[in-house]
Amino acid sequence: MMSTYVTFKHFAWAGNLVRSVFMSRNVGRYQSSKTENSQDGNPLLKYLTMKIKATGPITVAEYMREVLNTNPLKGYYMHHDMLGEHGDFVTSPEISQIFGELIGIWCVSEWISGGKSKSLNLVELGPGRGSLMSDILRVFNQFRYLLNTCDISIHLVEVSPKLSEIQALNLTENSTEAKYEDKSPCYKMGITKTGLPINWYYNIQDVPSGYTFYIAHEFFDALPIHKVQKIQDEWREILIDVDQEIPQKIKICSWF
C-alpha cells in the first residue's frame, strides 16, 4: 500500500492534489507530501469524508469533479471569479486581445475555405470571463460584409453560475434565464453586443449539431483524470480515501 496525505485549502483546488501526487517524497514503502493543518468546519471536506465513508474510496477523477466543478458548497469554479489581476491566475486572453483576434481570423479563413456554409455554430468550452469570445466576435463584426450570408450562433458550455454571469455581462447587453417550461437544452440565452444569438449549456451534448467550430482554451488541463500507477509489474488506480488515523485529512492510496 502506498499513501499520500492531502489537506484542503480554502477552495480545495486540484493544484494541491497534483502537487501532493507528483512532488511527493519516497519514504520506504510510503510516499508523503508536505501538508498544512486542515481547516476546521470545511463543508467540502466534511461532505467528501461522509461520502467516502458511505460508498468507499473515490477516484481522482471524482475528487477533481467535486473540488473543481460540480460541488455547490465549495467547488473552485462555482462561486468566485478566479481570473484576472485580482484572481488566482491569468490566461492569455486577459492579457492581450491579439490571441483571440487571430483565432477569429482563422475561423473566418476556415469558413471561407470550407465553402462558406450558410450556418455556423461557434462553440467554446469553459469560456472563462468571455474575453476570448469577445475578441473573436470583434473580428467577426469587422468581417460582417463577408459573413452576412452566414447564420452564426454562439454556444458556451459552462457549469459555473458565477462565470456564466460574468460572461453574460461581458458579451451581451442583456441575457435571460431559460424557463423550465420552455424545455430548452440551454439554461441562459441572449444576444451578443454584435447582434448574434448566444446560449449557455451545462453539457456539450446539448449543443445543436451543424457546421461547427469548437474552441477550448486552457480547458482540457482542468478536466478530471483517472490516475494509475505501476507497482511491482501491476497497474493500480489511485483512489482517495479517508485517513483513519487523522480524521481531518484524506489520503491518496493505490488500489489493486
Describe the role of every protein-language-model region.
Residues 1-39:
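N-terminal mitochondrial targeting presequence
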Residues 4-10, 37, 47-50, 56, ...:
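Class I S-adenosyl-L-methionine
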Residues 6-12, 20, 50, 178, ...:
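Hydrophobic transmembrane signal anchors and adjacent membrane-proximal interface regions, especially
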Residues 29-35, 65-71, 133-134:
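Short, functional N-terminal and low-complexity linear motifs
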Residues 36, 55, 87, 91, ...:
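Conserved aromatic-histidine-acidic binding/catalytic patches
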Residues 39, 43, 47-118:
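Conserved Class I S-adenosyl-L-methionine-dependent methyltransferase catalytic core
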Residues 96-192, 201-202:
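SAM cofactor-binding core of SAM-dependent methyltransferases
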